[in-house]
């Protein structure tokens, strides 16, 4: 499907399942706040889970529609009686505390007007079971999106439950349920052989499901379905065969946008199962035949819903950053009516959260009571105050009952008391507990460039949006500002939109925070609202992490800061201004950061702006007044009804990808987005009103500005018929829906005076094509039991008019050829120029002149990358070669003709892949890394040799100094020897000292040599280890890169192959058309009648040949592709096989190097030592022992060539 997620979604939604205990019934005590009377009842649920009903001691039955139930509460969350006497009456039973046995069922038509059903169970376990089961039934998404058949069954169940004490069904209930036309009801009852007087009643056993269905068929006959049934094959027989039914489902009901591999068309066996399920006549079902009755049941069955159940389920990726989602958001959540007067309600927070909202607003003000408890209210208005603590408790109670994904608390903090702000923070910590996100997640630090965590990462967490205290300001100045805070205004000001141009704020009367433009703030309008909120204390500031409100300066500034945890709020007028001036920049901003839009202050009646405006810009928190159910709120409910009603909807891909730029005002097709064509035909309506009035249906489309069409279509008004009006009108066609993933279709029914009956909002991407019932809903999006509209929808990928003929020719060549011939004949008959037509057809120049035109209009030619790495070999015969004028070419054999157009395609070799730019670039990078590594080790070696040379010089100088001293002493001794009295033993002592000095010198040099040798060995080993590790990593990276390059090139080759296939088909058709032209030329010499006969035969045989040749060509192309794919696999495997081979070679190479290394170092040191000692001997500075047997020590600093030695030829090698 266009834009669909890859893979088939496994449905997680659970069907309605009513437990036995709810079916059998349980004893409860029912009580009311305004009465001290308690009523023992037996409470039950019908087996289908439609109604909650109870019978009192007088056997009178009351019903509660489960679709109206909002919540079920027990224990401390349930309502408790205030009257002590009433409490005493209720304290019955001996198992468990009274509080734990209390149940409150909350129900109502909308969020504001709610009622309570208060019950007391006799056991705690029973109270818990019923609470959980009732809440589960009331929030079941499949129950909220039932099939048409299920709604009709619900009406039947209601009639069966509302019986007299004798167990009979009063006919007045039937007349009341189908009140639009009493005469029709009377006639339908008579057709079922039932009494028709309003005061009569009938036994339940006489009103079976089959009788009820016959009654409905008579009350609401469906001639339009009979026509569809006949048109699709049942003209001469009263049934459809399994093949006809299969064609109907696959051709009419199947979505052509679906991938045929993931969502294959139905097969005979599957269709047979459907026939057996819906066909009431078992003998027909066994034969694979479906009657019109079975066909009607199938159309109203669960398999034929207008929206796939997978779209209702949680089917979107929830692991992307928070900024990539639209988030269901509420404005001034506590209000139940207008913005200036009315009651504030704690219950509104529960109701809004239960409805799927994930972002609520808390306008906090300083409490004026002695307890100094902060309150929530709309400042400087006549709205009432509610307790901040009670609101926090309500949020904690209902935060995650319907969705596990994070709650965002948008604080508008006007509390200018540090003590009360500390209380607020304490309540949040204590009541929310571990659910409150106090610290940022380890994976997502509050740093520039780091994206926000995902809804999946933040499951069951509550995040606070409040002003963050600036650490720059001192504590004293903070307190001073806090005490001086003037509470003369109220605003969202969790973040403030600050005009980027001077004077912009003064020129606009709309302020930047919630309700800043209210009339009671005239004095502060010009000043803006930057200081309208109180300074955040340390306690409140510590609660803020991922949602830090900041003043908006410009999109450029936000981009430079690149801090995803900073967000800004925009009043709707400022948001619209930015959207108009900088649409692309607004979308870019919303890819990384959150933005919140809220209604302008002049909407004192709590009306709403259209949220679609800001969804188009990717704004996440588009906050609305939930208490007002206008069109804008209906669109919002339609948006968040899907994806498991989680409150989060993944934005379209182009609004998330950093490499794509999206303009919401685009009018043309966006590259990469598959546009849709949508056609809607309103066929008929059923039970649209309970009055005998005329009705009509309107169709709207909402989406991007180019896609939006308000009141795009309106049917004629039916004449006094609300039961089964039929509209035979042309369908409304939305030719090009540019962004289907953000577009929705609204189908609404009205009475002739314009009174709203019901509607349904359907995402374009989720709509199933075909014949469907649209079960209508009321303003609050609650399903209506009987009203429905029967429609026929066509939806497909958009094809521009330019390519329509080409698409048709490629998809159905036979029909296309026939159509072309038919048009030619019609034109010839019209102009009476048969001879000229034949002459034109016979002219070979005509064919060649058409070729360029065909090439220009071929879609496959557009946007093709001709530099793609594909090396097709030229065919043996040039495709455009023409025979000599007048000559007739003999018909070619099938294989020869196919081979003449078939291009040989060869897979790229590994060596060719290695020449790809990205791979060569990586090799160069590795070359540089190895070069740098060797250079670093060369430097270390040079330094080591210099160090040893210095040491040698020190030893040598010490030796020379000490030897000189001994020789000097020896000279003195020789003078004394010349005296007769001096002893002779002095010379021998000096010789011994010199010998000892020589021995000491020799030993020092040997030690120095050993040390140098060991250090050089260690250094070279370290170099080899580094080289080996580096090369091992290079092998991994190069193999991975080569694999990626291979996959990319091979994918490009396969894409190019598709284009080649299309060109080959065209070439084949061209050649065959040329043969046909030659045959026509041959027939020119014959008389006209014979020529016409031969021409007709030629056309017939030509069509057959074209089909056969194309089929054989496709087979040859398929084999070629299989061979190419197999070769691709082989090459990828060869690449993978190179990795262990290269690693083994690397291991062996360095094993050999390590083995040779000690000897190489020894030889290197010996050679160096020989030269040094020889040099010193010539100068007489070497010890005599070394002069005769020099020690092998490196005593000089070699050149870089000497140091690198064997590395010179290999140091910059790369493994591949």
From Swiss-Prot:
**Modification type Phosphoserine: residues:** 236, 417, 511, 582, 887, 978, 987, 1197, 1199-1200
Q: Which GO terms describe its cellular component?
A: chromatin; cytoplasm; GABA-ergic synapse; glutamatergic synapse; nuclear membrane; nuclear speck; nucleus; postsynaptic cytosol
Acidic residues composition bias: residue spans:
507-518
Q: Where is the lipid attached (S-palmitoyl cysteine)?
A: 17
Instruction: Describe how it is modified after translation.
Output: Palmitoylated. Palmitoylation at Cys-17 by ZDHHC21 regulates the signaling activity of PLCB1 and the function of the endothelial barrier. Palmitoylation by ZDHHC21 is stimulated by inflammation.
PI-PLC Y-box domain residues: 540-656
Where does it primarily localize? nucleus
Q: List this protein's GO terms for biological process.
A: activation of meiosis involved in egg activation; cellular response to fluoride; cellular response to glyceraldehyde; cellular response to ionomycin; cellular response to vasopressin; cerebral cortex development; fat cell differentiation; G protein-coupled acetylcholine receptor signaling pathway
What EC numbers are recorded for this enzyme? 3.1.4.11
Report keywords, A-Z: Calcium, Cytoplasm, Hydrolase, Lipid degradation, Lipid metabolism, Lipoprotein, Membrane, Nucleus, Palmitate, Phosphoprotein, Transducer
Q: Is Manganese tagged as a keyword? A: no
UniProt cofactor(s): Ca(2+)
Where composition is biased (Basic and acidic residues), the residues are: 472-483, 967-979, 1075-1095
Name the catalysed reactions.
a 1,2-diacyl-sn-glycero-3-phospho-(1D-myo-inositol-4,5-bisphosphate) + H2O = 1D-myo-inositol 1,4,5-trisphosphate + a 1,2-diacyl-sn-glycerol + H(+); a 1,2-diacyl-sn-glycero-3-phospho-(1D-myo-inositol) + H2O = 1D-myo-inositol 1-phosphate + a 1,2-diacyl-sn-glycerol + H(+)
Q: Entry's PROSITE patterns?
A: C2, PIPLC_X_DOMAIN, PIPLC_Y_DOMAIN
> Which stretches make up the C2 domain?
656-784
Question: What does it do?
Answer: Catalyzes the hydrolysis of 1-phosphatidylinositol 4,5-bisphosphate into diacylglycerol (DAG) and inositol 1,4,5-trisphosphate (IP3) and mediates intracellular signaling downstream of G protein-coupled receptors. Regulates the function of the endothelial barrier.
Misc note: The receptor-mediated activation of PLC-beta-1 is mediated by two G-protein alpha subunits, alpha-Q and alpha-11.
> How would you summarize the oligomeric state and partners of this protein?
Interacts with DGKQ.
Q: Which PANTHER family match?
A: 1-PHOSPHATIDYLINOSITOL 4,5-BISPHOSPHATE PHOSPHODIESTERASE BETA-1, PHOSPHOINOSITIDE-SPECIFIC PHOSPHOLIPASE C FAMILY PROTEIN
What protein does this entry describe? Answer: 1-phosphatidylinositol 4,5-bisphosphate phosphodiesterase beta-1
The species is Rattus norvegicus
């Amino acid at each position: 499907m266009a834009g669909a997620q890859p893979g088939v979604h496994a449905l997680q939604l659970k069907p309605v399942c009513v437990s036995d205990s709810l079916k059998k019934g349980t004893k409860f005590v029912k009580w009311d706040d305004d009465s001290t009377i308690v009523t023992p009842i037996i409470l039950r649920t019908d087996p289908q889970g439609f109604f909650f009903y109870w019978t009192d001691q007088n056997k009178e039955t009351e019903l509660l529609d489960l679709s109206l139930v909002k919540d079920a509460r027990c224990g401390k969350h349930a309502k408790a009686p205030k009257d002590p006497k009433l409490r005493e009456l209720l304290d019955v039973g001996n198992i468990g505390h009274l509080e734990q046995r209390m149940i409150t069922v909350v129900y109502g038509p909308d969020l504001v007007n709610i009622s309570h059903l208060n019950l007391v169970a006799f056991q705690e376990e029973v109270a818990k079971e019923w609470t959980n089961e009732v809440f589960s039934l009331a929030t079941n998404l499949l129950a909220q999106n039932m099939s048409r058949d299920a709604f009709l069954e619900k009406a039947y169940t209601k009639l069966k439950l509302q019986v007299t004490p004798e167990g009979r069904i009063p006919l007045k209930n039937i007349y009341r349920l189908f009140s639009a036309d009493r005469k029709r009801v009377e006639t339908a009852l008579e057709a079922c052989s039932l009494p028709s007087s309003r005061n009569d009643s009938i036994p339940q056993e006489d009103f079976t499901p089959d009788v009820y269905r016959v009654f409905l068929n008579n009350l609401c006959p469906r001639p339009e379905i009979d026509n569809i049934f006949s048109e699709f094959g049942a003209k001469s027989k009263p049934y459809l065969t399994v093949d006809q039914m299969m064609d109907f489902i696959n051709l009419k009901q199947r979505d052509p946008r679906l991938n045929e591999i993931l969502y294959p068309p139905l097969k005979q066996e599957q269709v047979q199962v459907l026939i057996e399920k819906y066909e009431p006549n078992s003998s027909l079902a066994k034969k694979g035949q479906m009657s019109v009755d079975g066909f009607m049941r199938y159309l109203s069955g669960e398999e034929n819903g207008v929206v796939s159940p997978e779209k209702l389920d949680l089917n979107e990726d929830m692991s992307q950053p928070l900024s990539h989602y639209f988030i269901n958001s509420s404005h001034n959540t506590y209000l139940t009516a207008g913005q200036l007067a009315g009651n504030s309600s704690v219950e509104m927070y529960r109701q809004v959260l239960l409805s799927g909202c994930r972002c609520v607003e808390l306008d906090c003000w300083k409490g004026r009571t002695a307890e100094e408890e902060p309150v929530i209210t709309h400042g400087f208005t006549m709205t009432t105050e509610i307790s901040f603590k009670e609101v926090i408790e309500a949020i904690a109670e209902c935060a995650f009952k319907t969705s596990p994904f994070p709650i965002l608390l948008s604080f508008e903090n006007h509390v200018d008391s540090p003590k009360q702000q500390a209380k607020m923070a304490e309540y949040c910590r204590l009541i929310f507990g571990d659910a409150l996100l106090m610290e940022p997640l380890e994976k997502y630090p509050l740093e520039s460039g780091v994206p926000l965590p995902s809804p999946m990462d933040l499951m069951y967490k509550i995040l606070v949006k409040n002003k963050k205290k600036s650490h720059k300001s001192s504590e004293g100045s903070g307190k001073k500002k806090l005490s001086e805070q003037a509470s003369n205004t109220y605003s969202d000001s969790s973040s403030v939109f600050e005009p980027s141009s001077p004077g912009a704020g003064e020129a606009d009367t709309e302020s930047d925070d919630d309700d800043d433009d209210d009339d009671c703030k005239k004095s502060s309008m010009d000043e803006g609202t930057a200081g309208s909120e109180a300074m955040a204390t340390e306690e409140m500031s510590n609660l803020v992490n991922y949602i830090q409100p900041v003043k908006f300066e410009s999109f450029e500034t936000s981009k430079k800061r690149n801090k995803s945890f900073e967000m800004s709020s925009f009043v709707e007028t400022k948001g619209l201004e930015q959207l108009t001036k900088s649409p692309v920049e607004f979308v870019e901003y919303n890819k990384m950061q959150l933005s919140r839009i809220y209604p302008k202050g002049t909407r004192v009646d709590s009306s709403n702006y259209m949220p679609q405006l800001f969804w188009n810009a990717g704004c996440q928190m588009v906050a609305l007044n939930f208490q007002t159910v206008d069109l804008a709120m209906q669109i919002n409910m339609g948006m968040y009804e899907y994806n498991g009603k989680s409150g989060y909807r993944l934005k379209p891909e182009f609004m998330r990808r950093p490499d794509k730029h999206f303009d919401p005002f685009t009018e043309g097709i966006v590259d990469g987005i598959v546009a849709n064509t949508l056609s809607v035909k309103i066929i008929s309506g059923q039970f649209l009103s309970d009055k005998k009035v005329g009705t009509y249906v309107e169709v709207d489309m909402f989406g991007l500005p180019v896609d939006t069409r308000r009141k795009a279509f309106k049917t004629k008004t039916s004449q006094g018929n609300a039961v089964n009006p039929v509209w035979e009108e042309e369908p409304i066609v939305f030719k090009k829906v540019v962004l289907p993933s953000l577009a929705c279709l609204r189908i609404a029914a009205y009475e002739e005076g314009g009174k709203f009956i019901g509607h349904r909002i359907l995402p374009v991407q989720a709509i199933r094509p075909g014949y469907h019932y649209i079960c209508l809903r009321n303003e609050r999006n609650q399903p209506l039991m009987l009203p429905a509209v029967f429609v026929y929808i066509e939806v497909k990928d958009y094809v521009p008019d330019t390519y329509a003929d080409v698409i048709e020719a490629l998809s159905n060549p036979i029909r296309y050829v026939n159509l072309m011939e038919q048009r030619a004949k019609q034109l010839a008959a019209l102009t009476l120029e048969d001879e000229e037509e034949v002459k034109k057809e016979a002219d070979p120049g005509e064919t060649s002149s058409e070729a360029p035109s065909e090439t220009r209009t071929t879609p496959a030619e557009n946007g093709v990358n001709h530099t793609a790495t594909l090396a097709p070999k030229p065919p043996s015969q040039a495709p455009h070669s023409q025979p000599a004028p007048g000559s007739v070419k003999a018909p070619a054999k099938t294989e020869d003709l196919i081979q003449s157009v078939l291009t040989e395609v060869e897979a790229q070799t590994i060596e060719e892949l290695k020449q790809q730019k990205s791979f060569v670039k990586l090799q160069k990078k590795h070359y540089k890394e190895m070069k740098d590594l060797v250079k670093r080790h060369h430097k270390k070696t040079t330094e080591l040799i210099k160090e040893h040379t210095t040491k040698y010089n020190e030893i040598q100088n010490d030796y020379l100094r000490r030897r000189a001293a001994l020789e000097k002493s020896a000279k003195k001794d020789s003078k004394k020897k010349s005296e007769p009295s001096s002893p002779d033993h002095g010379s021998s002592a000096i010789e011994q000292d010199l010998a000892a000095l020589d021995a000491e010198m020799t030993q020092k040099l040997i030690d120095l040599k050993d040390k140098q040798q060991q250090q050089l060995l260690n250094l070279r080993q370290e170099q080899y280890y580094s080289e080996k590790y580096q090369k091992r990593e290079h092998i991994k990276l190069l193999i991975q890169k080569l694999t990626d390059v291979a996959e990319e090139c091979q994918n490009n080759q396969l894409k190019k192959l598709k284009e080649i296939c299309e060109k080959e088909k065209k070439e084949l058709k061209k050649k065959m058309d040329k043969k046909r032209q030659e045959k026509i030329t041959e027939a020119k010499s014959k008389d006209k009648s014979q020529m016409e006969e031969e021409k007709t035969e030629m056309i017939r045989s030509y069509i057959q040949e074209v089909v056969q040749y194309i089929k054989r060509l496709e087979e040859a192309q398929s084999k070629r592709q299989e061979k190419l794919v197999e070769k691709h696999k082989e090459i990828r495997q060869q690449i993978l096989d190179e990795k262990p081979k290269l690693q083994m070679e690397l291991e062996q190479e360095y094993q050999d190097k390590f083995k040779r290394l000690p000897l190489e170092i020894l030889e290197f040191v010996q050679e160096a030592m020989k030269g040094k000692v020889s040099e010193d001997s010539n100068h007489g500075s070497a010890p005599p022992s070394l002069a005769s047997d020099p020690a092998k020590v490196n005593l000089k600093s070699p050149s870089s060539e000497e140091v690198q030695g064997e590395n010179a030829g290999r140091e910059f090698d790369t493994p591949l």
